[in-house]
Design a protein with these regions (language model features):
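Active-site nucleophile-His-acid catalytic modules used for acyl/amide transfer and hydrolysis
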Residues: 95, 485-604
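Glycine-rich catalytic cores of cysteine/serine-nucleophile enzymes that process amide/ester linkages
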Residues: 82, 105, 117-183, 190-197, ...
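Long, compositionally biased intrinsically disordered regions
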Residues: 23-27, 62, 66-80, 524, ...
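Extended, solvent-exposed polar beta/coil surface segments
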Residues: 1-225, 229-230
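Long, charge-dense tracts
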Residues: 135-394, 409, 429-430
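A short, compositionally biased domain-edge/stem linker segment
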Residues: 392-404
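Generic extreme N-terminal start-of-chain segments
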Residues: 35-106, 271, 285-286, 290-368, ...
């Protein structure tokens, strides 16, 4: 009888019939299971919180004791490998020594008379951020065009089309059949629901300008998600240009969703000092490509102090940024010049995080798994202001330990997770639960334009709910999503990006002209998810609840990718014949590894062996409340769906589980951990996301 209670729900879930037709008979069983699981989770989280609290108290008393014995951080600041624990002291005179160690030699070397104030003399040190770069402008309802095109104010263009700069063109989708399939699949009518209007009143930003429109395409939702036309993007190549000379109308035709970026120009600098107290002007020195040092032209720029958000937390601060431990390696600064021809920074990116130089390397599967489980987020508050890069390799051999596994042109999958904001001015965390956020992305190894060294170029695929900050679901470059001074998370949250290098996922397959691309398929699935999140599947609202989140829907994209690739192979006899004919080929071995990876990932995504009904049918997204008929039982059904995929409920748990699967399949993992990097805000501290 007991076995029946567990088997019956499985049979029902696997059937194609409606979930609620059976929920009455299974109500009592479901309640017991859900309440039991919920109780277990909360008890486990409470114990974790209690242990963490005790550990912090012990650390506090240890620091107090060390302080009384005369120890100081100044003596250990000389070692690059020592992480300094910032003390939240009341005496502001000791802040620099407490946080960043002794004063930088760079700041003492500047002489005001060598500062260059000639904009033309430094113009060559700034480079455009993208070849095709512009601002999206939403047309009025009366101006709308077929295929959901939008206006595109051109900020930068290739040399051949420099005449386009400053003009407004039509940006539209290719009429290619596959592209139009994507466009039509995610186009929606938008009509705000009561839940959406309630969310608006609480401060979240929803696509108000699109409310009441019909058949809204993905370009329109990208342009119209915010209340104003402030989304700036780069266009992926190829871009087809149609120049109607007779009507002075320009059209730009694309086949991929634009990528969000910020700023017009980019430079690489080291910050020397603040020009004047209580001023946002800083003296910086540009990178010299010849000497490979920061001994180029000195210039005055502005790094504005942004206003706090509604919770009183500023996303970034310029306070003591010149004393940051990352300053010696430099910052990529993104922005544009103001009316006084002074460069105003809109986003920053520490050069160190993009470099292919690990701070630590762990060899062997056992040590690599142990690092992921216990060391990755260890003692997060003490790492404030720091960056750490770690290479995990499943191979035990250390012979080639100094050789980077990355080469120019390599592509890796990014698994992104961030934590919480603690400290006196931090956000609340009931029972110490910090959910955080999860996303996928793509990292490519490119040649740096300023230094000629190899570096990572990271692009996130943000399945992001509507929020009070105006962060838009979609593809975003690192500098836009993380480095934006006003909206980015670099300065106030701890972040972990795990970049996976596994050829069976990142390389295409060519079966005598039949091309299969797992990475392209994953990108397409995520593009569809992100577009649907912008519309809320027609409700105008994608909201996070305890049982539903971005991590569930990002995981859904992986599941859909696995099933689609598998189905294509099973349905194509030519591919199967190729695999049978070439059993020893390297491509066959890679493909077998891909299948094994898919099976392992399925165990993570659906640990109970039961496919969620919404995943099987690819219907409603977890983070979207469509306000269909609601009932007590539909709420229970949602909780059961979450329980079925319980390993993807929390971002950190999902990141760890997927990373471990990839390691076991032979992948190299490159971990980038940042902890409230940039200037110093004494009222906040980084808090690790909750995991099990």
């Amino acid at each position: 009888m007991a076995a029946y209670f567990f088997i019956a729900p499985t049979i029902i879930l696997l059937s194609g019939q409606s979930f609620e037709q059976f929920i009455l008979t299974l109500g009592l069983i479901a309640l017991v299971v859900i309440f039991g699981l919920t109780a277990f989770i909360f008890i486990r989280l409470f114990m974790n919180w209690l242990q963490d609290k005790s550990a912090r108290n012990r650390d506090f008393y240890k620091r107090q004791f060390k302080g009384k014995t005369g120890n100081s951080t100044a003596s250990i600041a000389k070692s690059k490998n020592v992480f300094l624990e910032p003390l939240f002291v009341e005496n502001k005179d000791n802040l620099t020594a407490s946080i960043f160690g002794e004063k930088s030699d760079i700041a003492e070397a500047i002489e005001p008379e060598i500062i260059c104030e000639d904009t033309a003399a430094v113009a060559h040190l700034y480079k455009p951020i993208a070849l095709w770069h512009g601002r999206l402008i939403l047309p009025s309802n009366e101006q709308r065009q077929p295929y959901g095109s939008v206006f595109f104010e051109v900020i930068n263009a290739p040399k051949k089309y420099q005449s386009f700069i400053g003009k407004t063109a039509f940006l539209q989708w290719s009429t290619n059949r596959h592209i139009q399939f994507f466009v039509h699949a995610v186009s929606q009518d938008i009509n705000f629901t009561k839940q959406t209007k309630k969310s608006q009143k609480s401060g979240n930003i929803h696509p108000d300008r699109l409310n009441g429109w019909r058949n809204i395409g993905p370009l329109e939702t990208l342009a119209g998600t915010r209340l104003e036309d402030s989304v700036t993007v780069m266009l992926r190549r190829p871009v087809i240009v149609v120049n109607h000379s007779s009507s002075d109308r320009q059209e730009l035709i694309i086949d991929r969703e634009p990528v969000q970026i910020i700023g017009r120009l980019c430079a690489l600098v080291s910050i020397l000092q603040r020009k004047e107290p209580n001023n946002d002007k800083f003296i910086v020195r540009h990178f010299n490509k010849t000497s490979q040092q920061f001994d180029g032209i000195a210039e005055i720029i502005r790094i504005p102090q942004v206003q706090p958000d509604k919770n009183g937390i500023a996303r970034s601060t310029n306070h003591l940024i010149e004393q940051s431990p990352l300053n010696a390696d430099g910052w990529y600064i993104y922005g544009e010049r103001d009316e006084d021809n002074i460069f105003v920074v809109q986003a920053i990116e520490p050069r160190r995080i993009a470099q292919l130089i690990p701070d630590e390397t762990h060899f062997g599967l056992k040590k690599s798994l142990a690092y992921l489980s216990s060391e990755n987020w260890q003692n997060t508050p003490a790492q404030k202001g720091q960056v750490k890069r770690v290479l995990l390799t499943p191979n035990d051999s250390t012979e080639n330990g100094l050789i980077s596994p990355w080469q120019e042109g390599d592509i890796g999958i990014v698994i992104h997770c961030f934590g919480g904001i603690g400290g006196k001015g931090g956000e609340s965390a009931p029972l110490g639960i910090v959910t955080g956020h999860f996303a996928f992305g793509v990292a490519k190894v490119v040649r740096d334009r300023f230094t000629s060294e190899q570096r990572f170029d990271i692009e996130y695929k943000q399945v992001y709910a509507h929020n009070p900050d105006g962060i838009v679901a979609g593809s975003s470059k690192w500098q836009s999503y993380m480095g934006d001074l006003q909206r980015g998370w670099l300065g106030d949250r701890p972040v972990c990006d795990i970049i996976c290098k596994l050829d069976c996922v990142c390389c295409d397959y060519d079966f005598d002209g039949i091309i299969l691309s797992p990475l392209s398929e994953l990108n397409q699935q995520l593009d569809m998810m992100m577009a649907r999140y912008r519309t809320g599947d027609g409700t105008g609202a994608s909201l996070v609840t305890p049982a539903t989140s971005c991590v569930q829907d990002s995981s859904h994209a992986i599941y859909a990718t696995i099933k689609k690739i598998t189905a294509e192979v099973e349905a194509n006899p030519e591919i199967q014949d190729w695999l049978k004919t070439n059993p020893a080929a390297a491509q066959t071995q890679r493909f077998q590894q891909l299948l094994a990876l898919g099976e392992s990932l399925e165990k993570v995504l659906i640990p109970l062996g039961v496919v969620r009904p919404d995943w099987r049918k690819n219907s409603r997204l977890a983070g979207i409340d469509s306000e269909l008929k609601k009932s007590f039982f539909s709420g229970i059904a949602n909780l059961i769906k979450a329980a079925i995929s319980y390993r993807t409920m929390l971002p950190r748990r999902t990141q760890d589980e997927i990373a471990k699967v990839l390691l076991k399949q032979g992948a190299f993992l490159w971990i980038i951990r940042t902890n409230q990097v940039g200037g110093f805000d004494p009222n906040i501290e980084p808090i690790a996301p909750t995991g099990f």
